[in-house]
Amino acid sequence: MKKKIFNTLWVVGVLTFAGFCLPACHRELDVQQSYDFALQTMPVQKEIKKGETAEIRCSLKRAGNFADTRYTLRYFQPEGKGTLKMDDGLVFKPNDRYPLTREEFRLYYTSQSVDRQTIDVYIEDNFGKVQQQTFAFNNKKVEWFNQSLL
């Protein structure tokens, strides 16, 4: 009789243990696909004159690496007038998205204005995460003087 009670308790114990373990398992793996990222840049000049080009060295720093993550770049210029291009020569149009295929790249901003200029650069991944960085340039004053007065 004791053996039958022991066997019954053992079976109930095993079934209880299985009851706790089985709900924790499911067939689908929980794979993280979207990771945080940041756009880092080297210091950029603060003054620019019309026709001058400023180099912006950029680096995309990712918290993780998912193979199917794609990044795009776009920019908007709320102040001033100028052009922005990639180091491979591609000239960007404001608010158009361009695929970003490298983590290290350079942007070149060429001033076409004598006013204060601001550009907002946006990097977005295919999961909807966005990083924005603003670059502001003041007009570089050109000193004109008459050398005959010296």
Predicted regions and their residues:
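First exposed extracellular module after export/assembly in secreted or surface-exposed proteins
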Residues: 2, 33-150
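Bacterial Sec-dependent N-terminal signal peptides
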Residues: 2-7, 17-42
